[in-house]
């Protein structure tokens, strides 16, 4: 008896695309960190935009605006903590992603590797300018 996912026309398309996807044998869970980087970046951008709607950068009212976000904005404390912890998770995923590339020898593809290193430096410079200096 054959499986329905291999005989039904619609399920056969889904099966060939997701379940029985031909993939290399060294494709492991370490390869998910590139996708997690995209998710973390999207969360950072969204929470950053929503936090920027209520934040005031003036030195006399900056603390009060953060207190306003945490106390008066609906789920503002969740946005703030998601943004703070999302940055940490982003860098953890970034370092694991680079480490995976080092382990599997991706540095042999010099053009792709150099673009990735430039992106790494740009992310680190952005984090330094936006989070460390202020």
Swiss-Prot record:
Keywords: Electron transport, Heme, Iron, Membrane, Metal-binding, Mitochondrion, Mitochondrion inner membrane, Respiratory chain, Transmembrane, Transmembrane helix, Transport, Ubiquinone. InterPro entries: Cyt_b/b6_N, Cytb/b6-like_sf, Cytochrome_b_N_euk/bac, Di-haem_cyt_TM. Heme b b566 binds at residue 97. Its cofactor is heme b. It holds the Pfam family Cytochrome_B. Heme b b562 binds at residue 83. Belongs to the cytochrome b family. This is Cytochrome b. It comes from Anoura caudifer. The lineage of its organism: Eukaryota, Metazoa, Chordata, Craniata, Vertebrata.
């Amino acid at each position: 008896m054959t499986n329905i996912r291999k005989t039904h026309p619609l399920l056969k398309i889904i099966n060939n695309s997701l379940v029985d996807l031909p993939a290399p044998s060294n494709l492991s869970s370490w390869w998910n960190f590139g996708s997690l980087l995209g998710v973390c970046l999207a969360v950072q951008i969204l929470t950053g935009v929503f936090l920027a709607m209520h934040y005031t950068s003036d030195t006399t009212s900056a603390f009060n605006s953060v207190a306003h976000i945490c106390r008066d904005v609906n789920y503002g404390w969740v946005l703030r903590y998601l943004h703070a912890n999302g940055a940490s998770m982003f860098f953890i995923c970034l370092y694991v992603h680079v480490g995976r590339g080092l382990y599997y020898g991706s540095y042999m593809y010099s053009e792709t590797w150099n673009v990735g290193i430039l992106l790494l430096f740009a992310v680190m410079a952005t984090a330094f300018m936006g989070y460390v200096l202020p």
